[in-house]
Amino acid sequence: MAISFLNEDEGLSFTRSLLVGAARPGAAIAAHVAADSDSGIVRIDVAEAVESTCFQAVRQAGTKAYIGYGERVFIVDCVTEDVVMHQMDGYFCEFFDAEELETSGADFCVLASSASELFAFGPDGALLWKTTQLGIDGVLVHSATGTHIKGSGEWDPPGGWEPFILATRTGERVSGGSAPRR
């Protein structure tokens, strides 16, 4: 399956259309996503919210579409149309998937980072764990093994990155991940 953000003029035809993140009927649409599934192309409209939108990204794993936008991550099942939303502490940063990190995927399928946190999701889209206070202006993942996730969080922008190591299965902090002492 393929997934991408859409431009208004792409002219695709969709088998289904979903609206995610709307707190009220008639909410304005901030972004459009197309997810190609076995049953056709699903259009997912992301409702506008009052939040910072620094970065946006999409990933697809099995029947799940992961959408990072604003301060939220949406997990949409393209078959059942079930939607789960996770509110982030600060803006969404980036997705990292097990394949990209060259891990087996046994402990997580997708990682999502925010300005200060890291979320781990399983192959069914369920939240496995969340680790907070890894930075204040961005969290990056550099590598992952069956036992550890190595990354860095920005504590003193611009450029004040501090390393951290988390346990892959639990997200428990092994080392780092806190503001440097002055």
List each language-model region with its residue ranges.
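A short helix->beta-strand "capping" segment at the edge of beta-propeller domains
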Residues: 2, 29-51, 78-80
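Structural recognition of the beta-propeller blade-terminating site
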Residues: 77-80, 121-124, 165-167
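Short beta-strand elements that form the blades of beta-propeller/WD-repeat-like
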Residues: 11-31, 56-69, 73-74, 102-114, ...
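An internal, amphipathic alpha-helical element
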Residues: 112, 129, 139-143
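Repeated scaffold domains used in trafficking and secretory/extracellular systems
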Residues: 2-22, 45-62, 88-107, 134-146, ...
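Acidic, small-residue rich beta-repeat scaffolds with periodic aromatic anchors
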Residues: 143-182
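Charged linear interaction tracts used for macromolecular binding and regulation
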Residues: 70, 75-104, 114
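Aromatic (tryptophan-biased) beta-strands that constitute blades/sheets of beta-rich domains
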Residues: 39-48, 83-91, 122, 126-135, ...
